[in-house]
Amino acid sequence: LPTYRDAAEKVREMFLANLALIGEIPAPTFEERSRAEMVAERFAAAGLQACVVDRLDNASALLPGTEGSSTLLLAAHADTLPAEDNKPDIEIHQDRVVGPFVGDNALALAALATLPVLLEQLNIRLKSNVVLLAASRSLGRGNLDGLRHFLAESGTPFQSALCLESFQLGRLNYAAMGMLRGEMTCRLPANYDWAQFGSTGTIIPMGDIISRISRIPVPQRPLTTIIMGTVQGGISPGNVARETTLGFEVRSESASHSEPGARATGGHCERCHCAIRASRSTWTSMPGANRVPSTSDIRWCARAGPFSADSV
């Protein structure tokens, strides 16, 4: 361990430089090109081979192994949520680093770009090839499209893979959860009676939907949860809301529980208010294989495609 710490201290300045260079480039989902080009540039500076940015803005590079009989994938998502400041500054202090999305996922990208230099400092040569990937279009409606595209187009069979997340650097998770993420939208119909006194608009029916979803029984084993993370609707306190949208996510260690959870949320949506059209769109994430304990669940999520269900 002392040897590793000494080597890490030698590349500390490079790591922080990579953090600032990469993290200060805005990269909201679907707009990662500039950040991807910077990551590819840092890969090249670290001596990696085949440093490229593909048409979906994935930045990848190859660290050749001494034998090269197998290939490992080391990936980190490159996109972020939209930022209020289009030019985020990262402040580096003696004991902390402060800035937008440093923890999601700039630290991991900096670690990815610095790893080849650290291995060189430690005089470690891996037998296997390692492909380093900064994946685009991972969050929200990105639906892991960047990773899916890379895996489909690379033509390389990967024996194993690791995903780097800034908040969990130093922690190894060997299991994965299936996920369904979606939206429910209540809209006023075209023939809505605006003259009706006491018109409720769409917020009250959405509140009924949220109440019903919160009462859906979910098991603790396998671990299952329904997260209702966002609600958006209305333009002012004095106007009836024409449209209200709920963003939710169903997570489970078992597809047999996450799929009924998604169906149950849609069912409550359809029963809440006959005058409101409710639409649901879902998208899935987490493709993968050979993962314990939920391999079949992850494959199921990867196969699932967007769908919608409407009712009046």
What are these regions (language model features)?
Residues 78-92, 158, 175-185:
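Acidic-glycine-rich active-site phosphate/pyrophosphate-binding loop
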Residues 112, 164-189, 193-209:
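Phosphate/diphosphate-binding glycine-rich loops and adjacent basic-rich segments that engage nucleotide
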Residues 1-98, 118:
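Acidic/His- and Gly-rich active-site-bordering loop/insert found
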Residues 33, 101-179:
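Acidic/histidine-rich catalytic neighborhood of metal-dependent amide-processing enzymes
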Residues 30, 98-110, 197-203:
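Short, conserved micro-motifs enriched in small and acidic residues
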